[in-house]
Amino acid sequence: MTKMCCAGLAGCVLFLAVALPAASEPARYEADVCVYGGTASGVMAGVAAARAGRSVVIAEPSRWLGGMVGGGLRVSIDCKYPRDIGGLTKMMLEEDDRIGGESPHERQQAFRDLFRRLADTHGLQVLYEHRLGSVETAGGRLVSITLDYAPPGIDGCPAAKATGPAAARIRARVFIDASYEGDLMAGAGVPWCVGRESAAAYNESLAGVRNLRSFDLDPYVRPGDPSSGLLPMIDPEPVGPAGSASRHTMAYNFRLQFVGPGEGRPVPAPSEEYAARYALVRRALETNRAFVGWPNGNYNRQSVISGGIPGRQSGYAEADWRERSAIWREWSEHVRIMHALTGSTQTLKPGEYPDSEDFPPQLYIRLARRMLGAYVMTQHDLAYETRIDDPVGLGFYFVDIYPCRLVVVDGKVATEGETNELVSPGPYPIAYRSLTPKREDCRNLLVPVCLSASHVALSSMRMEPTYMILGESAGIAAVRAIEEEAAVQDIDLPRYLAALKEAGQVLHWDGTSYDDFRRGWLKWKTKQDQPAETVEPET
């Protein structure tokens, strides 16, 4: 029986497919491979499949390709150990070097142009401003997806609702969910999770609630009076014991770029709608008892609050588009309010985002859903405590978890969750099985971004170069599944690994020194562990 699944909801409701009236029939597309999400990973997946002669359609909710690469990041910024990066990602690193620039954050427009050229050169059909509406499955396979036309705002904020009835339907033999949110995966009925597992779930020492950083700042509406309630932005839930599970994942933010007064576009004045929520920031600034790291391009880890709205990210992954739009808008307002409260005179750097009023069009969604797939990558895989026989590429970054929320500890405000630990002796292999659902859940879907991993493991693998590597490997796997007429779980592994090597992917660490990266990480970590007042805001 064919079933349709309404996507974009917290739950998934199955119902029988019904014929639409002729007047509302969506445009129809057919391809060998459908990629949902034109992130950097999604483009790499599409290019890999197209290079093998397969037709590809990419559905992208925004007006741009590349996601965070071109939306605030460059390929090289989180690529501290490039020698073990190959394939298309290596090519992109070389392009990054050619693009040049004085800062690892600038020239964002050049990367958006680069991704568009890649799509054009390889004949990828891209449906911009189209997002998932519903999913059709039959016999354990995805059959088609129906897309809604929902143009985002000029600044990239998702539309609260689509402009009308279903706009497009894509049928494909293999689907790849390369979105940051994992909407196609969820819509297909594949199990997934959000938040942080407990330390006991996978026996991970870095998992769960941990690392409280306390500030000499009163959390109550009336200082010293718990009965007056907590200030906005402070999580009222109990902190929980160390290592316990939490629904909160790491903070999101925009990767902003500023220049001096008069050199760029002024940051717009904030609205009054959210002003009352910032009493905590006002108190920190007025009492000078907690570091407020603004302006900066990141989430300053010593700051009580900076680029991220504490805890607000935790509802994003499971929200519908109306709620996501509201959350995204709150982040835009957060930038304006923080700029106004701190009295910053810096301006938005011109030329980086000329078609979104110099404001980044992509919210940095560090983690959202995580698939519960055929294999779950964990801290033990990063530490080489397991054996991976189906590697699709190498991860290399440390476990990097930004503060997750604000809590109360002993009557003071504290951040919770920040973790930065290098547990890997060297670049570690990522299992192909972590890109595939369990066979009984879906047989023609690959997931290179919201892959099957614990919160700890994905906190290392979440870097854009790694996502790009996984995207290319997913594209090659899709080709193998089509050519072998097999489920993605059943492709011939030796032939697949040979295809990855032929594409230039690096599958094994050669054991040579990781010391340069380790020394750099230790230097960075030492700086992060200094008292907040002695650390300059990140730029």
What spans do the regions from the language model cover?
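Bacterial N-terminal signal peptides
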Residues: 7-19
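Conserved N-terminal/central alpha/beta ligand/cofactor-binding core
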Residues: 48, 54-55, 59-141, 193
